[in-house]
Design a protein with these regions (language model features):
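Nucleic-acid substrate recognition interfaces
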Residues: 1-145
Length: 145
């Protein structure tokens, strides 16, 4: 397994910011849902249990369904890692001092690569391919600011 860091061209910055804002919205929803369920029942939600509550979110938010799955899985992993009932909110406001940097996770089925372009959902992003991405098999990853 190898980690590749590729740079996406700057002209896609606004679209990536919008997608990162949607990711923050889903993260905050899952965080709130999990905490309310814990208070009500005394049990933690697993990523699988949350799936029925986030069903259809990909159509509303413009994110790929595998991205929603990755957000849920990452949330549960971090909640267990830090042993917290509720994690911090992810803030999208650019003027906020506590603004969360852009993070858009994806899985293999949510991403397509062809000739220096990465297609995520219905959006194409140009990138500088210094590694020759076509030689590698991408399984998971994320767009990070």
């Amino acid at each position: 397994m190898k980690t590749l860091k590729l740079r996406i061209k700057d002209k896609h910055c606004k679209m990536l910011d919008q997608l990162a804002s949607e990711v923050n919205f889903v993260w905050n929803y899952v965080n709130d849902l999990s905490f309310k369920h814990l208070k009500r029942t005394g049990h933690f939600f697993s990523a699988f249990d949350m799936a029925k509550y986030t069903k259809g979110t990909s159509k509303l938010c413009g994110l790929h369904s595998q991205t929603i799955d990755a957000i849920r899985e990452e949330f549960v992993t971090r909640r267990i890692q830090f042993k917290k009932a509720k994690l911090k909110w992810r803030v999208s406001n650019k003027k906020s001092a506590r603004r969360s940097l852009g993070w858009i996770p994806f899985k293999k089925s949510g991403l397509k690569y062809a000739d220096g372009w990465v297609e995520y959902g219905k959006t194409k992003f140009g990138l500088w391919d210094s590694y020759g991405l076509s030689k590698y098999s991408v399984r998971t990853g994320s767009f990070v600011k």
